[in-house]
Amino acid sequence: DFGRKTYNARSETVSEKPSYKHAWSKRHYALTLADAFYEPCYESGKAVRTKIRQANQEPMAIASIWDTWTEPETGELIVSFSMLTIDASNHPIMRRCHKPEDEKRTVVPLRPDLFDRWLNATPDTALALLNIDSIPELVFSE
């Protein structure tokens, strides 16, 4: 299913991939609002669905892109989005998620002081914002 494969977009290739390059080049930047997100944590040896929130318990805004496309069978105009991901191997919380042998990735919740910069960025500036330093403090939550 196409939609299932495109809910996350790798920041390293977002400008090149056919699914995303139009949205990226047109600067269709968005913020996806969430109270938390979930990732599998394998520290116990088994996959445990783990809730991740901001340490201050405030909702977060995840760096995303959006675009429109026409559904071929119905002609309906569809608005869709994808959250951007980065390497998380150096993030104190996110590097603990996913299988030990798997690549560590994370979506990019942005610090509030970066919202306007993200939404009004050039592609180069947007790419520069997609890094671990842009992420507010995160914690595992119940």
PLM regions: where:
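A structured binding-face within diverse protein domains that lines the active/interaction site
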Residues: 1-142
